[in-house]
Amino acid sequence: MSKDIYYSDKYYDEQFEYRHVVLPKELVKMVPKTHLMTEAEWRSIGVQQSRGWIHYMIHKPEPHILLFRRPKTD
């Protein structure tokens, strides 16, 4: 199922590195509606990315799109 997960390219501002992840419809029901996911939670539904990414925002009109960020390291 994780083969159907889409990972955006990374994009940046002065402070953070960002990316969004688009889930297939069958995984949307596993996304909590009440809170942002911990790393353990997003990994448990099949999202695979390096450590340090934070699920930082819920975009209610599109719950299948997960928004992540992490501090820039350069």
UniProtKB/Swiss-Prot annotation:
Q: What Gene Ontology terms for biological process does this UniProt record contain?
A: anaphase-promoting complex-dependent catabolic process; cell division; female meiosis I; female meiotic nuclear division; histoblast morphogenesis; regulation of mitotic cell cycle; spindle assembly; spindle assembly involved in female meiosis I
Protein family according to the UniProt entry: Belongs to the CKS family.
Subunit field text: Forms a homohexamer that can probably bind six kinase subunits.
Function field: Binds to the catalytic subunit of the cyclin dependent kinases Cdk1 and Cdk2, and is essential for their biological function.
Question: What name is this protein filed under?
Answer: Cyclin-dependent kinases regulatory subunit
Q: Does the keyword Mitochondrion apply?
A: no
Q: Which residues form a coiled coil?
A: none
